[in-house]
Amino acid sequence: MKRMSAARPARWTRRHLDLLVDAAATTAPVIDPAAMPRILPDHDLWDLWPVQEEDGSTCVIGGQELWMALSAPILGHPEERHDRARIRLLAKDGDSWTDLGHAFADGASPGSREWSGSAIRRPDDTVSVFYTAAGRRGEAPPTFRQRVVEARPALVADGRRILLDPGAEHRELLRSDGHMYLPAEELTGAPGRIRAFRDPGWFRDPADGRDYLLIAASVAEDDRFGGAIALAGTRDGAWSLLPPLVVAEGINHELERPHIIVHGSRYHLFFSTQRHTFHPADFAPTGLYGFVAPSLTGPYEPLNGSGLVLANPRAEPDQAYAWLVLPDLHVVSFANYRSSPGGDLRSAQADQARAGFGGTVAPILKLTLNGTATSVVPAEGRRTSP
């Protein structure tokens, strides 16, 4: 496809992080554990996203919204859930969630795990599910090869039961080119310490009506802290990689779950990252970060000067993660780890970590956007329902 004219990638630097301050406008309230009902009693849920219509709204079937999330059986240490991750289909009616089972049939994915993505209902009642295939089908132990895959199953409504046709083909769309973006093909690794080429977020640019994917990626920097947000575009069904929109200049390893919301004719680019992936670790909080630009390709500038949009509170620095901003500016996430006297639960014994892990939908928040300034405001009347 013909390359878009693009501004140079925005560089997220130490200078920006030096502007970061504790402020109520960018701090989430402490989560009450009672406000986090477990949707699936035997499975962890994390990394939620709605099935969208092509206009960006959430798909509604028979009065129920369709959502997806990553899921894994509640076994062992919560960090091991990534080695068993499958995409789950969910229906939501108000504050009530219904489990619709795995989105795909066993063995349908080319990977050994299914990691985060996005989903769009098409006019022909199929659903384009863009997701990350991690590893290779049938492998043991799991590896960390990552590529972007599309499945396009038919949406089948049978009474109040909603299904995706299990016979859909899973087609690899993109993998890192090894030039603009580093290969994400490690055989061994762990969350927060591997290269990225994952989390495809679908976006239709109102300026040209074309479809794009935003991808969490890695670029070559002087050290390993070269997280980036890749852009890919399609023409006549063929996808190709474009230059990155944002590059972390030696300050962060992972810019995860990138997505764009157009608000007030401005392009708001959001992503999530964790405190332990900064350089040095804990230099900045786990949170939702973002940039804003007049067009898809920039030029981008960090929101609130630093890029920080929404941080976990100091008292609970890991309480939630994987924030996703919806078109109405409500923000969904999942409940991660509560604070523990024993320190970081990611490295704790399995039983201690399990006792402090949420593994379900976190309370809903809402943003206001005003130029380069943002603020967290109460999502009135909403608990776990965007």
PLM region descriptions:
Residues M1-P386:
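Carbohydrate-active catalytic/glycan-binding domains of CAZyme proteins
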